[in-house]
Amino acid sequence: MKAIADTGFLVAFGNRNDRYHAWALGIAERVTEPLLTCDAVLAETAFHLADSALVLAFVREGLVRPAFVVAEHISRLAELAARYADRRPDLADLCLVRLSELHPKHPVITTDLSDFRVYRRDVIPLIHPPGL
């Protein structure tokens, strides 16, 4: 599966007590190559899980691959930040929107539909838990 990983998915995958853990495990079983993400998502995930070592293991074991350098996309990130200023987007979301622009056929795996239904290039394809 070629996709982009958001924080909510990674937190659900790493926390067996998360309400979406079973869903995240099912998604992870379908992963055949590392999911694309960014350093901001990894930092958020480490914060929410309170476990940097686990997040580093996600990278080391090939679940995810940081595929984005902020400095290389700073102009576009600033444009996106201005465009969505009313939503107060965080850096992780801005980076994922940019990743989705760079990889338009890759859905974003997320538990955060409220933001990703607003952030759009045309329509950002999403994979999310049922019922969201």
What is the meaning of each model-derived region?
Residues M1-D18:
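Metal-dependent nucleic-acid phosphoesterase active-site entry motif
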Residues A3, A22-R88, R98-H106, R117-L132:
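PIN-domain endoribonuclease scaffold, especially VapC-family toxins
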Residues T7, D39, D93-L94:
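Conserved glycosyltransferase catalytic-site signature
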Residues L10, L94, R98-L99:
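Short, hydrophobic/amphipathic alpha-helical patches that form generic packing surfaces
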Residues V11-G14, A92, R117:
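Generic, ordered loop/turn and secondary-structure boundary motif
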Residues T111:
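Conserved residues at the C-terminal ends of beta-strands
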Residues S114:
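Flexible glycine-rich beta->alpha loop in the catalytic core of nucleotide-sugar glycosyltransferases
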